């Protein structure tokens, strides 16, 4: 099993290109099942989760082609992928494939909407609380689907096609909003989605669906209206920048000191996180093609954070921000309101010398003067990258085990950090 070795204490300086967002690319790839024409996606990151979904789509009969690199592209540049679902041979998504990644469960929506049936295994993926699929199933039932759970599979059918309806989510759900959008796009009549997720990745999916011929209004607000159409066509769409990768590297710069330009990204994708970061004494400046993050000298000021759905502070940056706060000059309080059991990184950060106390959904961080390198173990995607951030600032060497979690969500992480001066190396098993 691969490990990452980091010798900390070096400020980061230079430029880091931001990849396309995994959390946008996954639903966009799944949307290829809505049409028999080709969907071309630009700036798709090279990640384990992308490869896993490609296998799942291939199991359904979707043709997949990676277009060659353009001049000037590097290994850190996203790929262009063409997906064609003109010969779907199977509407079953088996356990051995779906269990590798939760988002693959979303294939149930386009399969049901286009073919009238789907049999999809209950999902796997990061073990963060329960993360139930009940809201996704509720949305499909509102649209007229007949659903039963049989042998660990969700079996969905519709006799005469899906029909528009009012869907009111009791809590904000990104996955539920993705599923509702894709299903409603091919449903008869009008669908209203209330308490819809407002995340940029939802907007990106809606914009792609509109290019494919869908009629959608209100994406980016809590009320989305979808007028179903008879068919969707192919299109070409560029995946939006990864706001979580952007925030992760911004916090790494803040923790180590230095001056880094994050390019191919936008401030509006994570305004709340950048505002919080600025309150810690880090200089954050918008650039024409990205964001400049600088902290040259001076201590890290403590700040309190509560995770919230967009436009609030992202839960996917909670672990990274906690790592930053371990070196703050004072106490900070971090409350997690989105997922249960998302403090699994606390025990491993403590191995580096962090002082963190947990009380339910609240983590109280007492800043320390320094961290010291130690062997640590990644438990999930975001926890693993928080350990990378901590290790970059720690004295001495840190060995991070189980880094396959990182490969699920961060493209060319070692190369991007190394080009800014980090002493980081992957040791192959």
Curated annotation (Swiss-Prot):
Source organism, top-level taxon: Bacteria
Main location: cytoplasm
CDD domains per the UniProt record, alphabetical: UdpNAET
Keyword line: Cell cycle, Cell division, Cell shape, Cell wall biogenesis/degradation, Cytoplasm, Peptidoglycan synthesis, Pyruvate, Transferase
Catalytic machinery residues: 126
Keyword Cell wall biogenesis/degradation: yes
Residues that, per the record, bind phosphoenolpyruvate: 22-23
Protein's pathway: Cell wall biogenesis; peptidoglycan biosynthesis
Keyword Transmembrane in record: no
Entry-linked InterPro entries: Enolpyruvate_Tfrase_dom (IPR001986), Enolpyruvate_Tfrase_sf (IPR036968), MurA_subfamily (IPR050068), RNA3'P_cycl/enolpyr_Trfase_a/b (IPR013792), UDP_GlcNAc_COvinyl_MurA (IPR005750)
Location of the protein in the cell: Cytoplasm
Modified residues (2-(S-cysteinyl)pyruvic acid O-phosphothioketal): 126
GO biological process, any: regulation of cell shape
Catalysis: reaction(s): phosphoenolpyruvate + UDP-N-acetyl-alpha-D-glucosamine = UDP-N-acetyl-3-O-(1-carboxyvinyl)-alpha-D-glucosamine + phosphate
Family affiliation: Belongs to the EPSP synthase family. MurA subfamily.
Role description: Cell wall formation. Adds enolpyruvyl to UDP-N-acetylglucosamine.
Name this protein carries in UniProt: UDP-N-acetylglucosamine 1-carboxyvinyltransferase
Organism phylogeny: Bacteria, Pseudomonadati, Pseudomonadota, Alphaproteobacteria, Hyphomicrobiales
């Amino acid at each position: 099993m691969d490990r990452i070795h980091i010798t900390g204490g070096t400020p980061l300086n230079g430029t880091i290109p931001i990849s396309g967002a995994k959390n946008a690319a996954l639903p966009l790839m799944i949307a290829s099942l809505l049409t028999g024409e080709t969907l071309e996606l630009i700036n798709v990151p090279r990640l384990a989760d992308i490869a896993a979904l490609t296998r799942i789509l291939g199991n359904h009969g979707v043709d997949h082609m990676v277009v060659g690199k353009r001049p000037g592209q590097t290994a850190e540049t996203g790929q262009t992928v063409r997906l064609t679902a003109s010969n779907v041979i199977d509407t079953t998504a088996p356990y051995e494939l779906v269990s590798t990644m939760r988002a693959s469960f979303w294939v149930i929506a386009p399969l049901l909407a286009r073919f009238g049936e789907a049999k999809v295994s209950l999902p796997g993926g990061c073990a963060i609380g329960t993360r139930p699929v009940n809201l996704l199933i509720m949305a499909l039932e509102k649209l007229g689907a007949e659903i039963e759970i049989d042998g660990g599979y969700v079996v969905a059918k519709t006799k005469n096609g899906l029909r528009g309806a009012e869907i009111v989510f009791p809590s904000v759900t990104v996955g539920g909003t993705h599923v509702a959008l894709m299903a409603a796009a091919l449903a008869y009549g009008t669908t209203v989605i209330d308490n819809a997720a407002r995340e940029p990745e939802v907007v990106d999916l809606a914009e792609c669906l509109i290019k494919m011929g869908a009629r959608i209004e209100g994406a980016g607000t809590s009320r989305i209206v979808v007028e179903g159409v008879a068919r969707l066509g192919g299109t070409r769409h560029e995946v939006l920048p990864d706001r979580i990768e952007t925030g992760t590297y911004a916090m790494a710069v803040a923790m180590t000191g230095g001056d880094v330009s994050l390019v191919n990204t936008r401030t509006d994708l994570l305004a709340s996180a950048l505002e919080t970061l600025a309150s810690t004494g880090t200089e954050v400046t918008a650039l024409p093609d990205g964001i400049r993050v600088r902290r040259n000298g001076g201590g890290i000021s403590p700040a309190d954070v509560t995770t919230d759905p967009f436009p609030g502070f992202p839960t996917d940056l909670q672990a990274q921000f906690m790592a930053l706060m371990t070196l703050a000059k004072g106490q900070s309080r971090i409350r997690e309101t989105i997922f249960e059991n998302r403090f699994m990184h606390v025990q491993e950060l403590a191995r580096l010398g962090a002082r963190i106390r947990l009380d339910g959904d609240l983590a109280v961080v007492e800043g320390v003067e320094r961290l010291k390198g130690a062997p640590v173990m990644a438990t999930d995607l975001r926890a693993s990258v928080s350990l990378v951030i901590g290790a970059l600032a720690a004295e001495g060497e840190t060995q991070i085990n189980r880094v396959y979690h990182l490969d699920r969500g961060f493209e060319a992480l070692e190369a991007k950090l190394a080009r800014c001066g980090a002493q980081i190396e992957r040791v192959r098993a």
